[in-house]
């Protein structure tokens, strides 16, 4: 592999040190290595902001691992940044001097505002959804809050609170009592109050979280079969569960890993304060943050206005998808959707996910015609899809699995991006669009009227179409039968 196409970003955080190594490929990035080590640097800061020798040694030990991988990468294509703890530490110079010797490249201590800007860039390059967003990143010793539209930030704040510092300050007795949470939340709201008005003034349509705390919440919700949107009600529910556990060392929540458990209650308290103070309705997980911001900055790639479209184009190229056919199926599915939208009330994001499934429905053919839907589902489940959340990927895979043949209803109910009934409706429309676009020519797609009454679909074809298309009639009869097996009434006229 040509080393000139390799780039590395290292983030010396207050809780963890991270390294990301990527390869530039066709205007996007392909992840080659991700290494994360819990160093808990912030825990080594005393009241005088002096970093302990033990904490520094933990950091240097981690950097020796990273250094081995950096030897293969040209120095101009490496960026190493240090954040909150090394901004605060009075003896940061000692740590950084040795860190630079170990890594063989410069280490830059960045300001809180620069950290916030880079986090926003990482989100803008990797996260789909509405353009106007609020980005929240709860680190070990600082929390970044950024508003922006597209690639442009409108306000940037870096606040002195984080999951490690709040752990040491409000959960040092290791008790998970209501009082501990109350104190931690009140303190976080006090820190937030001076910046809340400006954030609200700029406003946002979507809120995304880009930190270990939000990642942990996502993992918990996926494990417990909830949908992926984080809401205040869910956060309060998890807080009550933590309080029931009583002690930090006894904290057990389905989906919460041991590695994340230590700083979970403190991160949760900060997030509850942010939701309450800013009146956030819901939050989803970002596709990338600081490290991705560093990498895309080195590559000088423009922020794509529609990340999901870029992702679909890249995958279609990679798996040699017939884009004319993908567009034909998408156009037909969209036509069907418009005809039933008054009855089914499908939301815009669900429509977008249906059309994404149409664009990718034939990628399984690149493996083999036999079991192509299984291959398509497998590929989508395991590919990196910038712009799509983990739950959305799971829904896409489930739709592709059920694009033809008998329906696996349980898989449609196990995804948690949309309610089960909506997943069933999207699946029905996808199957019909694929069936009627099967001749692969625009002039051979019949004029179809589709009506929905609750779950009953009535499909009306031109007068003598069925009589002149015996194979088409056979395929439609078979589809009616498959849909009836799972109690989806389909009446063809």
From Swiss-Prot:
Alphabetized, the UniProt keywords read: Hydrolase
Please indicate which superkingdom the organism of origin belongs to: Bacteria
Recorded coiled-coil stretches: none
In which pathway does this enzyme or protein participate? Answer: Purine metabolism; ppGpp biosynthesis; ppGpp from GTP: step 2/2
Question: What Pfam family does this protein match (any one)?
Answer: Ppx-GppA
**Could you tell me one molecular function GO term of this UniProt entry?**
guanosine-5'-triphosphate,3'-diphosphate diphosphatase activity
Looking up SUPFAM superfamilies in the UniProt record yields:
Actin-like ATPase domain (SSF53067), HD-domain/PDEase-like (SSF109604)
EC number(s) on record? Answer: 3.6.1.40
What EC class does the entry list? hydrolase
> Is Transmembrane one of the keywords?
no
Q: Does the keyword Hydrolase apply?
A: yes
- Reaction catalysis annotation: guanosine 3'-diphosphate 5'-triphosphate + H2O = guanosine 3',5'-bis(diphosphate) + phosphate + H(+)
Q: Which GO terms describe its biological process?
A: guanosine pentaphosphate catabolic process; guanosine tetraphosphate biosynthetic process; nucleobase-containing small molecule interconversion
Q: What does this protein do?
A: Catalyzes the conversion of pppGpp to ppGpp. Guanosine pentaphosphate (pppGpp) is a cytoplasmic signaling molecule which together with ppGpp controls the 'stringent response', an adaptive process that allows bacteria to respond to amino acid starvation, resulting in the coordinated regulation of numerous cellular activities.
Q: Give the record's family classification.
A: Belongs to the GppA/Ppx family. GppA subfamily.
Q: Name it.
A: Guanosine-5'-triphosphate,3'-diphosphate pyrophosphatase
Q: Which organism is it from?
A: Salmonella typhimurium (strain LT2 / SGSC1412 / ATCC 700720)
Kindly list the organism's lineage.
Bacteria, Pseudomonadati, Pseudomonadota, Gammaproteobacteria, Enterobacterales
């Amino acid at each position: 592999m040509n080393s000139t196409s390799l780039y590395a970003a290292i983030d010396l955080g207050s809780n963890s040190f991270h390294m990301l190594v990527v390869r530039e490929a066709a205007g996007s990035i392909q992840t080659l290595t991700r290494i994360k080590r819990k160093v808990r640097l912030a825990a080594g800061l005393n009241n005088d902001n002096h970093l302990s020798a033990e904490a520094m040694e933990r950091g240097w030990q981690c950097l020796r691992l990273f250094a081995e991988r950096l030897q293969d990468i040209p120095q101009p294509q490496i960026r190493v940044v240090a954040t909150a703890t090394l901004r605060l530490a009075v003896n940061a110079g000692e740590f950084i001097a040795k860190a630079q010797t170990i890594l063989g490249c410069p280490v830059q201590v960045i300001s809180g505002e620069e950290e916030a800007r880079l986090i926003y860039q990482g989100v803008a390059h990797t996260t789909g959804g509405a353009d106007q967003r609020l980005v929240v990143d709860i680190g070990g010793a600082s929390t970044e809050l950024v508003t922006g539209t597209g690639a442009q930030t409108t306000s940037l704040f870096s606040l002195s609170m984080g999951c490690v510092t709040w752990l040491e300050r409000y959960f040092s007795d290791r008790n998970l009592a209501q009082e501990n949470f109350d104190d931690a939340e009140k303190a976080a709201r006090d820190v937030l109050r001076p910046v809340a008005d400006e954030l609200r003034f700029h406003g946002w349509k979507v809120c995304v979280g880009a930190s270990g705390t939000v990642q942990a919440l996502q993992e918990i919700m996926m494990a417990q079969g909830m949908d992926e949107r984080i809401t205040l009600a869910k956060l309060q529910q998890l807080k009550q569960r933590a309080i029931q556990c009583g002690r930090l060392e006894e904290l057990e929540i389905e989906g919460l890993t041991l590695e994340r458990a230590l700083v979970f209650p403190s991160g949760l308290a900060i997030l509850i304060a942010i939701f309450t103070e800013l009146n956030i309705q819901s939050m989803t997980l970002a596709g990338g943050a600081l490290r991705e911001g560093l990498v895309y900055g080195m590559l000088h790639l423009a922020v794509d206005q529609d990340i999901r479209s870029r992702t679909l184009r890249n995958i279609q190229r990679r798996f040699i998808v017939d884009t004319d056919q993908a567009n034909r199926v998408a156009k037909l599915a969209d036509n069907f959707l418009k005809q039933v939208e008054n009855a089914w009330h499908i939301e815009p994001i669900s429509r977008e996910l249906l059309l994404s499934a149409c664009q990718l429905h034939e990628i399984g053919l690149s493996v083999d015609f036999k079991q192509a839907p299984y291959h398509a589902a497998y590929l989508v489940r395991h590919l990196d899809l910038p712009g799509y959340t983990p739950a959305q990927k799971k829904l896409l895979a489930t739709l592709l699995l059920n694009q033809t043949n008998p329906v696996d209803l349980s898989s449609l109910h196990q995804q948690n991006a949309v309610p089960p009934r909506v997943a069933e409706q999207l699946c029905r429309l996808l199957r019909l669009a694929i069936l009627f676009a099967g001749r692969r020519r625009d002039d051979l797609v019949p004029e179809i009227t589709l009506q929905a009454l609750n779950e009953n679909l009535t499909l009306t074809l031109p007068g003598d179409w069925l009589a002149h298309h015996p194979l088409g009639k056979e395929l439609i009869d078979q589809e009616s039968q498959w849909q009836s097996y799972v109690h989806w009434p389909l009446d063809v006229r």
